[in-house]
Amino acid sequence: MTQTTPDSREDAWLERSRATLAKAQPGARAEAVGRVEHVADGIALVSGLPDVRLNELLRFEGDRFGFALTLDADTIGAVLLDDADAITAGSIVTGTGQVVQVPVGPGLTGRVVDPLGRPLDGRGAVHADARMPIERPAPSIIERDLVAEPLATGILLIDALFAIGRGQRELIIGDRATGKTAIAIDAIVNQKNSDVICVYVAIGQRASAVERVIAAVREHGAPERCVFVFASSAASAGLQWIAPFSAMTIAEYFRDRGQHALVVIDDLTRHAATHRELALLTREPPGREAYPGDIFYLHARLLERAAKLSPERGGGSLTALPIAETDAGNLSAYIPTNLISITDGQIVLDTGLFAANQRPAIDVGLSVSRVGGKAQMPALRNVSGRLRLDYSQFLELEMFSRFGGLTEARVKAQVVRGERIRALITQPRFTPLRPVDEVALLGALAEGVFDALPVDLLPAIRTRVAAHLDAHGGNAGAVLEDTGTLDATAQALLVAAVRTLAQDCATASATAPPDPPAASAAELPQPDSP
């Protein structure tokens, strides 16, 4: 057995060192160095870096970072991603040769991160498979496929009238506090038992509001299949600006591997305001409503990344649900019209409907899905064909009925049907319906099963329909999930099951003891005299 002596180990190390030195090429390395000319409001004007490209990541003195937003002949308008207090005029700046990147991979699911992928949930470092640039080109036409597969939201009104397909971009728009985020979160919750990875990005919102969103998903959904990207109102404008692009990149990782992803952007109105702020600070010429001229291109290149890929590219999909806020219902403002023209449809929320306690408060007349109808389940399409027309006619007749009584039997029947439609589509939060539940309810509605029932029984029927169909619906649910269609026999079985449920609810309501009368003022306990 040969023993290794200290001298032999030293000789081996010396040989390796000589080989390394032989490959070395000593010499000075040139590195472009710039300086900060001026810094204020999260923007630094940098000079001395002529070779920096647009959106390139810049390293500032003190290991701070920013990116190049505007390029002039002599200066760069850099947006700071970190605290600007440590950066002063004269600070050294170097280019990194890379654009801003974000970590991606399954290790991000279940985590709360900032737009740079840094953890915000106190659960340690994020384990990523790779890092990808936040700005990536959208798939070309050759790489895309038709949007032909539904993305179920569990919301009856949306799935029936404004169906969303996987790979679609559907705008959710309305005034402040009308339930825009609630619809998006319900859509995320409904993916609990599906194969869809959800990414929720909050831009410029309060931490308490985002905490409520995360808590709702943890209570009702599958947080282990969600990624939460958060740029709070206290974060730098740069972090808020890159937030939706980071979320898109995180979702694209799953799409490019043949999986399905859903991105909720909450919201693009604040993102547009952030872009306007940065553009004005970097002295970009303002346009309509003081927005820079590239605001349309900014959101177009972001939302174009949502797509259904062809089978040759893996067949994955990325569905986008951007949210936008209107002012006093003005859909003709600059940002709303831009987003409506970019997306494949819009769900418009109405303040009056919300005040009337209708949830979701969707304006049926102004909402549309230009793509999702082709992806809707045929069975659901068959039973929802007249729903929109019947409901629209009811709303018009209801308005006229306030000025006088309705005497014609046909008109009375339309009002009766419309009242039951409204009761059926008024759906509380976190109560998603399965496709088979929706088909059964709408089929029974079309058959007139609910016409003779009191309107106040419809919520109870909607709540109990899932359990009742599991017991009496046969294998219709499994067939619907596999094929999207039902034959006449299966459809009749579902309608019969709902009819039985309606009769049971009516019987239970008739035999229930009446509510005790309200106590009069004299019978109420009086407070003690002082």
Swiss-Prot record:
Feature: compositional bias, Low complexity? 507-522
Q: How does it sit in the membrane?
A: Peripheral membrane protein
Q: Identify the residue position(s) of the site Required for activity.
A: S367
Q: Which CDD domains match?
A: ATP-synt_F1_alpha_C, ATP-synt_F1_alpha_N, F1-ATPase_alpha_CD
Residues annotated for ATP binding in this entry = G174, D175, R176, A177, T178, G179, K180, T181
- Location, primary (coarse class): membrane
Q: Which Gene3D superfamilies match?
A: 2.40.30.20, ATP synthase alpha/beta chain, C-terminal domain, P-loop containing nucleotide triphosphate hydrolases
Which Enzyme Commission number(s) are on file for it? Answer: 7.1.2.2
Segments of this protein annotated with the region Disordered? 507-530
Do you know which InterPro entries this protein is assigned to?
ATP_synth_asu-like_sf, ATP_synth_asu_C, ATP_synth_asu_C_sf, ATP_synth_F1_a_nt-bd_dom, ATP_synth_F1_asu, ATPase_a/bsu_AS, ATPase_F1/V1/A1_a/bsu_N, ATPase_F1/V1/A1_a/bsu_N_sf
Q: Which GO terms describe its molecular function?
A: ADP binding; ATP binding; proton-transporting ATP synthase activity, rotational mechanism
Which reaction is recorded as catalysed by this protein? ATP + H2O + 4 H(+)(in) = ADP + phosphate + 5 H(+)(out)
The subcellular location is: Cell inner membrane
One CC-aspect GO term? plasma membrane
The record's keywords, sorted A to Z, are: ATP synthesis, ATP-binding, Cell inner membrane, Cell membrane, CF(1), Hydrogen ion transport, Ion transport, Membrane, Nucleotide-binding, Translocase, Transport
So what does this one do? Answer: Produces ATP from ADP in the presence of a proton gradient across the membrane. The alpha chain is a regulatory subunit.
Q: Which family does it belong to?
A: Belongs to the ATPase alpha/beta chains family.
Subunit record text: F-type ATPases have 2 components, CF(1) - the catalytic core - and CF(0) - the membrane proton channel. CF(1) has five subunits: alpha(3), beta(3), gamma(1), delta(1), epsilon(1). CF(0) has three main subunits: a(1), b(2) and c(9-12). The alpha and beta chains form an alternating ring which encloses part of the gamma chain. CF(1) is attached to CF(0) by a central stalk formed by the gamma and epsilon chains, while a peripheral stalk is formed by the delta and b chains.
- For this entry, the protein name equals ATP synthase subunit alpha 3
